[in-house]
Swiss-Prot record:
Record carries keyword Transferase: yes
Record bears the keyword Magnesium: no
Gene Ontology CC entries for this record: autophagosome; cytoplasm; cytosol; phagophore assembly site; phagophore assembly site membrane
Annotated family: Belongs to the protein kinase superfamily. Ser/Thr protein kinase family. APG1/unc-51/ULK1 subfamily.
Biased composition (Polar residues): 577-589, 961-972
Annotated binding of ATP, by residue: 36-44, 65
Subunit structure: Homodimer. Forms a ternary complex with ATG13 and ATG17.
Gene responsible for this protein: ATG1
Subcellular location: Cytoplasm; Preautophagosomal structure membrane
Originating organism: Phaeosphaeria nodorum (strain SN15 / ATCC MYA-4574 / FGSC 10173) (Glume blotch fungus)
Any GO MF annotation of the entry: protein serine/threonine kinase activity
Protein name per UniProt: Serine/threonine-protein kinase atg1
């Protein structure tokens, strides 16, 4: 869900009165006002409640989420319907409530509770400015931010209690959220603020009488509400899910590994949110989900907190218990709800926030519950008796000590009329008595947790600057405290605070770039492809031979020390040893080998979704061109690209393959995968030209990305700054970046389809028993399949990483454009139709209207014309051969359906955004190029034959020449 921006953040919209007036619209009982936020497919507006039939305005605010239904595919529409259905059934103080819903033919207007303070992510980022705003000024005065880290622990515990209260309610209904993150945790000023500031009439419109009354926590602090249930679903306790949903930085490892998961995945997200509130950064940060999972695995459950941070032992223990990689070792829901941080009183509260029972002089707790002192609106004085959540005798305790609410009992008859009771409850089946309040009284004597010098975090690799001092420090266990004198404590605390502050400033920029912007579905596809490639690799004959040779090799001790040289006398390693080393070069994902779940093609993956989104701009006519700028497409340095790199066993059938027929389904399938890989390679080469204009690399890194020994080089992900763009204007960078991005996405679409074909074949044939003769043929096919799938997997991951880099470049360049430029972010609107929205992760807008098909079509025309001219003049015929084949491959890629479907589509259906007329035009051009290409190859064969004849007819005394060109289609 797109969340409203906080009041102390600069607004990107509604800058002028005219634009505000244009935004006003009557939607049922509400008037839509100014624009406050934007999502991938929705705009969020602030609305006000109006009296029916009178148009008299009230000052109570609501949030109106206006979803453009025309931009949603079936999957997203299902998510929207699911979100509305879930919100209708959920009524809890710490869950954003649905107030109303209005549907039009083109838009769905969802009226929800308005959260004035925005989301928790902005709250943490702008924590230094909270003291300057009326809604949070008193909070910061009472609980100032620490010098190192994020929010005061009192505030963190307050939010943790409220988050636990909402989760306990969700678990009682068997719901799992699946996308808990700071951006989906919205905040409202406390009711105490509205009461004391005399602005009760400005309180947001409440869905029911208790939605603005906190169920737990501190009454004077902001109120937290969980939002965005687009990925939520009903998941019974014994069920497991396997859909990759959520935001990578806050995803549980089992989801990143594409394993089945249960509701415990939400607990991991809770741990990441608590860590970020305490430390002002997520516990794990990475550019993509593969790197993120690697960092989580490498940490091995050792959660390290920044030095100098003020964090109690109980809070650290809770976060560490939540951030366990294995769900079986992770804290359970019952343990979480009964944890001291959630169940017990919040320590170090100021006197005015203490429950009234704690301030009473009598040692015994009062019999009657304390009554609220502030006055609430009249419509909130009466609470419906059929509230979906209930109260219990535990409501009589103070708010700071109240545990979260579970499904509840009926209101007590002793409840005072007109006084909204606390929405707190006892746990089901719990017979434990309520602890006397006086047992918590000693906690008030200690105003701040003592910061000791004990090493509370697991051991980590220290920088070189710290290793020199390591010998003088004693490491203590988590349960011990270092006996440091008080004077040394102060010095050490100052040193840690200063060092932590420097690190805080250095990490802030990295955090902004690494913070997740939304839902990244492409990560799911990468996990699926990695899992399939690993599974096929395990089942290939080569890998099985490696295992046998490894067992044989382990029976004897290897004495090989190195390569044979004249000086060392080392013997060359045996063939068996060489074989067993090969898998380590390309297949290191041991965790994926253990899974044998069927591969499921995902047609709604990011590859397909991104391509469909970008191809919303019509390609009809094909005569339109992007703005012509110096140095942009097509670059003069672009030449034809070689075919998909095959092994020595000739993975591809190069040349005229019309005469090649086969009745073997396996061979046909592998041939289809190889053809798709070849098409993707051609488009990838085109994208690489654009990429290297924006991110130059050393000459040694060019080519096929293959290093010494056949090891594939990892694409550079560090070059994301603007140092290499100094010679390009922002306008030029925007154009090149958009062209590169759409070409990479087109490449991903073809790679995606090739993996779908491989997955369908693998699921169908992997379990069958074969005769010895058939098994021998299958082994050869499996070898080819393993090689091509491994290549596709590596290329898919590389394109994902590079497309992320280009996306960042594009967003940076758009920010650097003049403010009056049409492509500047403040002049763009996803709903206006003037720009194309790409994906749902970063709200990338393509302003030039370019598509991959348009670029490929223009380039194919240019290359075929160049080849035709050279053919007529007889100049450089091998180069003409490459140009013709590359142009034909580009046109074939345009016509290739990106989805692997068992049913044949109608001729009138659009495929990849192309209408029938456009496809027919491209098909005619392709046939003409193929015809000329066939004629050219005949000319080349004639030249070769003439050259051979001239060699054989040469005098015997002259040496023969063997300088003929290499085989067809070879790149020069």
């Amino acid at each position: 869900m797109a969340t409203p921006s906080n009041p102390y953040a600069p607004r990107r919209s509604g800058a002028s009165p005219s634009s505000s007036a244009a935004a006003e619209q009557i939607i049922g009982k509400f008037k839509r006002m100014d624009h406050i936020g934007k999502g991938s497919f929705a705009e969020v507006y602030r609305g006000i409640h109006i009296v029916p039939n009178t148009q008299q305005e009230k000052r109570q605010s609501v949030a109106i989420k206006s979803v453009n239904m025309n931009k949603l595919n079936k999957k997203l529409k299902d998510n929207l319907v699911s979100e509305i259905s879930i919100l209708r059934s959920l009524h809890h103080p710490h869950i954003v409530s649905l107030i109303d819903c209005h549907e039009t033919p083109s838009r769905m207007h969802i009226i929800m509770e308005f959260c004035e303070l925005g989301d928790l992510s902005a709250f943490i980022k702008k924590r230094a400015d909270l003291v300057n705003h009326p809604q949070t000024q008193r909070m910061i005065e009472k609980y100032p931010n620490p010098a190192v880290g994020g929010l005061n622990e009192v505030i963190v515990r307050h939010f943790a209690k409220q988050m636990a209260s909402a989760l306990e309610f969700l678990r009682s209904k068997n719901y799992i959220h699946r996308d808990l993150k700071p951006q989906n945790l919205l905040l409202n000023p406390s009711s105490v603020y509205y009461s004391q500031s005399g602005t009760l009439e400005r309180m947001p419109l409440a869905a029911d009488a208790s939605s603005l009354l906190p169920a737990t926590g501190i009454e004077s602090l902001p109120m937290l509400k969980i939002a965005d249930f687009g990925f939520a679903r009903i998941l019974p306790t014994t069920s497991l899910a396997e859909t990759l949903c959520g935001s990578p930085l806050y995803m549980a490892p089992e989801i990143l590994r594409y394993e089945k998961y249960d509701a415990k995945a939400d607990l991991w997200s809770v741990g990441t949110v608590l860590f970020e509130m305490m430390c002002a950064r997520p516990p794990f940060r990475a550019n993509n989900h593969v790197e993120l999972l690697r960092k989580i695995e490498e940490r091995k459950d050792h959660i390290r907190f920044p030095e100098g941070i003020v964090c109690s032992r109980a809070m650290k223990n809770l976060i560490r218990a939540l951030l366990k990689r294995k769900p079986t070792e992770r804290m359970s829901y019952d343990s979480f709800f009964s944890d001291p941080v959630i169940r017990e009183e919040i320590p170090d509260m100021v006197d005015e926030d203490l429950p009234q029972a704690m301030q009473a002089s009598e040692p015994e707790p009062p019999v009657e519950p304390p009554k609220r002192v502030q006055k609430m609106p009249v419509e909130m004085d009466r609470r419906p008796s059929d509230s979906p959540y209930s109260r219990s005798p535990r409501d009589r305790t103070g708010m700071g000590s109240t545990p979260p609410s579970r499904p509840m009992s009926r209101p007590s008859s002793a409840q005072a009329a007109g006084t909204p009771p606390r929405t707190l409850s006892m746990r089901r089946g719990s017979n434990a008595p309520i602890e006397p309040i006086e047992e918590h009284a000693p906690l008030r004597e200690q105003r701040r947790p003592v910061l000791t010098n004990a090493a509370t975090a697991p051991a980590r690799q220290m920088p070189l600057s710290e290793q020199a001092m390591a010998g003088h420090r004693r490491r203590y266990s988590r349960d011990d405290q270092a006996p440091v004198p008080s004077s040394l404590k102060d010095t050490e605390r100052e040193r840690r605070t200063e060092a932590g502050g420097m690190r805080e400033a250095a990490e802030r920029a990295a955090q902004d770039a690494a913070l997740d912007d939304g839902f990244v579905f492409v990560e799911k596809r990468r996990v699926e492809i990695d899992a399939l490639a690993d599974e096929i690799a395990v089942g290939s004959p080569q890998t099985q031979r490696d295992r046998v040779s490894q067992r044989d090799t382990m029976k004897r001790r290897s004495t090989t020390q190195g390569a044979p040289t004249s000086t060392t006398g080392a013997t060359a390693p045996s063939k068996a040893i060489q074989i067993q080393r090969q898998p380590s070069l390309t297949h290191q994902r041991a965790g994926s080998y253990e899974r044998r779940r069927p591969y499921r093609p995902s047609f709604e993956s990011a590859t397909s979704a991104l391509t469909k989104a970008m191809n919303m701009v019509s390609i009809r006519g094909l005569g339109l061109s992007p703005p012509v700028m110096k140095g942009v497409s097509p670059p003069q340095g672009y030449s034809a690209f070689p075919t998909y790199p095959a092994a020595q066993s000739s993975l591809l059938l190069v040349g005229d393959n019309d005469q090649v027929t086969t009745k073997d389904e396996a061979a046909t399938t592998v041939k289809k995968i190889e053809e798709l890989a070849q098409l993707s390679y051609v488009i990838y080469g085109f994208a690489e030209v654009k990429y290297k204009q924006l991110v130059p690399v050393a000459p040694s890194d060019e080519g096929l990305g293959i290093g010494p020994g056949g090891v594939r080089r990892k694409p550079s992900t560090d070059v994301i700054e603007d140092d290499d763009d100094d010679d390009l204007t922002p306008d030029t960078i925007v154009t090149i970046a958009e062209e590169a991005l759409v070409l990479y996405v087109k490449t991903l679409a073809l790679l995606n389809k090739s993996m779908d074909v491989a997955g369908s074949y693998w699921n169908k044939h992997r379990r069958g028993s074969l005769s010895p003769e058939a098994a021998s043929r299958a082994a050869v096919i499996a070898e080819r399949l393993n090689r091509v799938v491994s290549w596709v997997r590596d290329r898919f991951n590389e394109c994902c990483v590079k497309s992320e880099i280009i996306a960042r470049k594009l967003k940076q360049a758009q920010q650097h454009l003049p403010t009056d430029h049409p492509s500047h972010p403040q002049n763009l609107s996803a709903a206006s139709g003037s720009a194309t929205t790409v994906g749902s992760a970063e709200n990338i807008l393509l302003t030039t209207g370019i598509t991959a098909e348009k670029l490929m079509y223009d380039r194919a025309i240019e290359m075929s014309r160049s080849a035709a001219v050279d053919e007529l003049t007889g100049h450089n015929l091998p180069s003409c051969d490459i140009n013709y084949s590359t142009a034909a491959a580009m046109l074939e890629a345009i016509l290739e359906d990106e989805e692997e479907s068992g049913s044949r589509k109608l001729d009138t259906e659009e495929i990849n955004g192309l209408e029938t007329e456009d496809r027919q035009s491209i098909q005619r051009l392709l046939e003409e190029i193929q015809r000329r290409h066939k004629t050219l190859k005949k000319k080349i064969e004639i030249q070769k034959a003439q050259k051979r004849n001239s060699i054989t007819s040469a005098p015997a005394g002259l040496p023969s020449s063997r300088g003929s060109p290499s085989s067809q289609g070879t790149a020069r």
